[in-house]
Amino acid sequence: MESLFPAPFWEVLYGSHFQGNLSLLNETVPHHLLLNASHSAFLPLGLKVTIVGLYLAVCIGGLLGNCLVMYVILRHTKMKTATNIYIFNLALADTLVLLTLPFQGTDILLGFWPFGNALCKTVIAIDYYNMFTSTFTLTAMSVDRYVAICHPIRALDVRTSSKAQAVNVAIWALASVVGVPVAIMGSAQVEDEEIECLVEIPAPQDYWGPVFAICIFLFSFIIPVLIISVCYSLMIRRLRGVRLLSGSREKDRNLRRITRLVLVVVAVFVGCWTPVQVFVLVQGLGVQPGSETAVAILRFCTALGYVNSCLNPILYAFLDENFKACFRKFCCASALHREMQVSDRVRSIAKDVGLGCKTSETVPRPA
């Protein structure tokens, strides 16, 4: 079994279960089209190692970046704005899913799931939670930007950090509508003499599979993207229609800067997720990736979804002056702390050497 991310509706369009979070396992198509441990010819070892290496690089870089983002927001009071509260939620979801990459990478290399039932359920649930919390959070950020740009008076009451926190809680609650059931249905089972981490679709599978697939596709991607598109269309019309959104040029620049940041984050998200969504639609039309090239492309498109989780901190550093200043302050403080530690260590060694020299000078030589 080789678990894939991030489209759990891939297999359920056709069959009884999927493995991990995205799989080609399917009981209704010819067996030679299936992607599992018994068909490792689809992916050579070198390609598997390349994909797993990409996973590990994304995992390490993404964890460092997202943890730094969360630290900066928690550490600095001025960073606790409504937009940054949503960014914190996005970083939290990305951090959780990045923690699953070592397990999924091991699964890809070995061709089976070696971590047991409990961890299988956990990884599956985190994949789904990340999928929904990310899209819902980006949607909330876009609506938040729309209110700030198009309804500045109402924004004074609506756009508060406490209300943003409440929205984040609601986002996780909504994601639980899918996350909890798939965690219950997920299990490590023996399939084709290999242990696989999979989700069993309830019977009748011919009915619930497509229903589940369509709902996931609509609510995790299409509807959020449509809402985001409407919000930004209205914002662009507003921004073109007025020279100043507020009475202050400085405040106006900040509004436009933050709006641009959110737009870029959304655009990168859609760009990273669209390829695998296209694969899902292609399979939905009955086309199965039956060649090594098709499977390899699918793997890298899946990895691209993970790459998105480590790109956001980089975007914040380049596009937001406040994040850039906080990141620079953190890095400089860390470097200064290391220099002080080295300096203290050098002084301590010098002191010890000096005491040793004094002692040797005062000890009388034997006659």
UniProtKB/Swiss-Prot annotation:
<feature type="topological domain" description="Cytoplasmic">
    <location>
        <begin position="72"/>
        <end position="84"/>
    </location>
</feature>
<dbReference type="InterPro" id="IPR001418">
    <property type="entry name" value="Opioid_rcpt"/>
</dbReference>
<feature type="lipid moiety-binding region" description="S-palmitoyl cysteine">
    <location>
        <position position="331"/>
    </location>
</feature>
<feature type="topological domain" description="Extracellular">
    <location>
        <begin position="186"/>
        <end position="208"/>
    </location>
</feature>
<dbReference type="InterPro" id="IPR001420">
    <property type="entry name" value="X_opioid_rcpt"/>
</dbReference>
<dbReference type="GO" id="GO:0007270">
    <property type="term" value="P:neuron-neuron synaptic transmission"/>
</dbReference>
<keyword id="KW-0812">Transmembrane</keyword>
<dbReference type="InterPro" id="IPR000276">
    <property type="entry name" value="GPCR_Rhodpsn"/>
</dbReference>
<dbReference type="GO" id="GO:0005886">
    <property type="term" value="C:plasma membrane"/>
</dbReference>
<dbReference type="GO" id="GO:0097060">
    <property type="term" value="C:synaptic membrane"/>
</dbReference>
<keyword id="KW-0807">Transducer</keyword>
<keyword id="KW-0085">Behavior</keyword>
<feature type="topological domain" description="Extracellular">
    <location>
        <begin position="107"/>
        <end position="121"/>
    </location>
</feature>
<keyword id="KW-0472">Membrane</keyword>
<feature type="glycosylation site" description="N-linked (GlcNAc...) asparagine">
    <location>
        <position position="21"/>
    </location>
</feature>
<comment type="similarity">
    <text>Belongs to the G-protein coupled receptor 1 family.</text>
</comment>
<feature type="disulfide bond">
    <location>
        <begin position="120"/>
        <end position="197"/>
    </location>
</feature>
<feature type="transmembrane region" description="Helical; Name=4">
    <location>
        <begin position="163"/>
        <end position="185"/>
    </location>
</feature>
<feature type="glycosylation site" description="N-linked (GlcNAc...) asparagine">
    <location>
        <position position="26"/>
    </location>
</feature>
<keyword id="KW-0968">Cytoplasmic vesicle</keyword>
<keyword id="KW-0297">G-protein coupled receptor</keyword>
<dbReference type="GO" id="GO:0001626">
    <property type="term" value="F:nociceptin receptor activity"/>
</dbReference>
<keyword id="KW-1015">Disulfide bond</keyword>
<keyword id="KW-0449">Lipoprotein</keyword>
<feature type="glycosylation site" description="N-linked (GlcNAc...) asparagine">
    <location>
        <position position="36"/>
    </location>
</feature>
<keyword id="KW-0675">Receptor</keyword>
<dbReference type="GO" id="GO:0007193">
    <property type="term" value="P:adenylate cyclase-inhibiting G protein-coupled receptor signaling pathway"/>
</dbReference>
<feature type="transmembrane region" description="Helical; Name=1">
    <location>
        <begin position="46"/>
        <end position="71"/>
    </location>
</feature>
<comment type="function">
    <text>G-protein coupled opioid receptor that functions as a receptor for the endogenous neuropeptide nociceptin. Ligand binding causes a conformation change that triggers signaling via guanine nucleotide-binding proteins (G proteins) and modulates the activity of down-stream effectors. Signaling via G proteins mediates inhibition of adenylate cyclase activity and calcium channel activity. Arrestins modulate signaling via G proteins and mediate the activation of alternative signaling pathways that lead to the activation of MAP kinases.</text>
</comment>
<keyword id="KW-1003">Cell membrane</keyword>
<feature type="transmembrane region" description="Helical; Name=5">
    <location>
        <begin position="209"/>
        <end position="233"/>
    </location>
</feature>
<feature type="topological domain" description="Extracellular">
    <location>
        <begin position="283"/>
        <end position="297"/>
    </location>
</feature>
<feature type="transmembrane region" description="Helical; Name=7">
    <location>
        <begin position="298"/>
        <end position="319"/>
    </location>
</feature>
<feature type="transmembrane region" description="Helical; Name=3">
    <location>
        <begin position="122"/>
        <end position="143"/>
    </location>
</feature>
<feature type="transmembrane region" description="Helical; Name=6">
    <location>
        <begin position="262"/>
        <end position="282"/>
    </location>
</feature>
<dbReference type="GO" id="GO:0031410">
    <property type="term" value="C:cytoplasmic vesicle"/>
</dbReference>
<keyword id="KW-1133">Transmembrane helix</keyword>
<feature type="site" description="Important for G protein-mediated signaling">
    <location>
        <position position="107"/>
    </location>
</feature>
<keyword id="KW-0325">Glycoprotein</keyword>
<dbReference type="GO" id="GO:0019722">
    <property type="term" value="P:calcium-mediated signaling"/>
</dbReference>
<feature type="transmembrane region" description="Helical; Name=2">
    <location>
        <begin position="85"/>
        <end position="106"/>
    </location>
</feature>
<feature type="topological domain" description="Cytoplasmic">
    <location>
        <begin position="234"/>
        <end position="261"/>
    </location>
</feature>
